[in-house]
């Protein structure tokens, strides 16, 4: 099983950026926790962070075709990353959108996600543990084969 974890703009600043909102755990610490969980169950976990939408799209195009699951925290691209949304939409793997903070308790512009319509589900407001919950959900879909996201969305055969 192969899971991709994609971290969008400014997530490289976790631990220093607004710790009252995003917590004090760094991105490296989050990735290490996720790698440890994945290794414990024999899952290949690939992580990427970029402040540039095109770099995230390049990663999806290179690694996404045979992925069994995608976890994405698009950061600010949540609200306007249409090219990222389109790159996700062309893949078959289930997609879990993760946000460290509860975006619905914050500024109104954060309430809209262009990613959500192509995601299987969304986890928000649970801090770094939201990533672990996403992994656990994806592990629960193991063995269901391609089309899991499509079946969940009811959009494709």
Swiss-Prot record:
Keywords: Amino-acid biosynthesis, Aromatic amino acid biosynthesis, Lyase. The active site is at residues 22, 99. The record marks 17 as: Transition state stabilizer. GO terms for biological process: amino acid biosynthetic process; aromatic amino acid family biosynthetic process; chorismate biosynthetic process; quinate catabolic process. Substrate binds at residues 73, 79, 86, 100-101, 110. It catalyses: 3-dehydroquinate = 3-dehydroshikimate + H2O. InterPro entries: DHquinase_II, DHquinase_II_CS, DHquinase_II_sf. Its EC number is 4.2.1.10. GO terms for molecular function: 3-dehydroquinate dehydratase activity. Belongs to the type-II 3-dehydroquinase family. Homododecamer. NCBIfam families: aroQ, PRK05395.1-2, PRK05395.1-3, PRK05395.1-4. This is 3-dehydroquinate dehydratase. It comes from Roseiflexus castenholzii (strain DSM 13941 / HLO8).
